[in-house]
């Protein structure tokens, strides 16, 4: 497994060098036009001897000489868009993603769309040797999204062996490629994932086949966004939906948004491997979670009931989980149900570093006939999902 990961890191390094080389052969543009763009243009010119122009949406946005400005419509109408490299100056992650989609939908190859932070990362990477990552590969000290390392219990060669076991379980070549690249990116501290992005989170049509008899368990239903998508894909033909959401504020919105649907049960509780009352943070933006041992801010936490899935006697055909790091415990709480009914699974594996090997192995232990897939569903380092279908 180590040799596969090292090769993936080398491949990633080579691809980045190739992207950087294109700066001298491609036409380079910066979008949107703002103060950061002006400073970045100076940097490209001074350090890399690259002359860049600005892109504006409309002529009224012009703030400099017209010779430096290209309208967005001109980019869209250009025949060979692979000749373009687009730099995005918005630092806000949501705005950056919107701009990324805008140019990707216009036909610019995704590898030719780079934001400023990504460019800085590329520069640092190609200016340093990659051999120094060997120690990280040995220990597999991956980082989670908040830059917390794996617990010391996982910093062993055993973790590398477990990743190898997961790799060998994966059903298709796409999953194997995504899995290796995920590990390589985490080891290399890379937070840009456009190269392994897949659309249709939880409902990848080549993996998940929905029927009119679905019993859908949505663990971490938030405000009903996934349920809305499920019902649309089912064309409103399903058997029942069970929506679990422990966050009080999100639960209220969930009921408001989904109460008009038929055959749906709302549960204002979380899922775990046992019935337990825990300290729970009602956070914003869908990131509510159980209090961790190292949390110092007790004022944010409230007592909340978490239940064991097996005691509910459900007969699910499809279980989705996005529950902020409690996925493994919730899976174990549903173990008898999963072993008995073999539902399709879509389980997030990005909240804790060890999830990328512990959760697939847990699923395989419950049913070794499952076909296991891995897909990644954002341009950043969140929303990695393990799928299992019987």
Regions found by a protein language model. Give the residues of each.
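Phosphate/nucleotide-binding beta-alpha loop and adjacent structural elements of enzyme active sites
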Residues: 1-29, 35-48, 60-85, 89-390
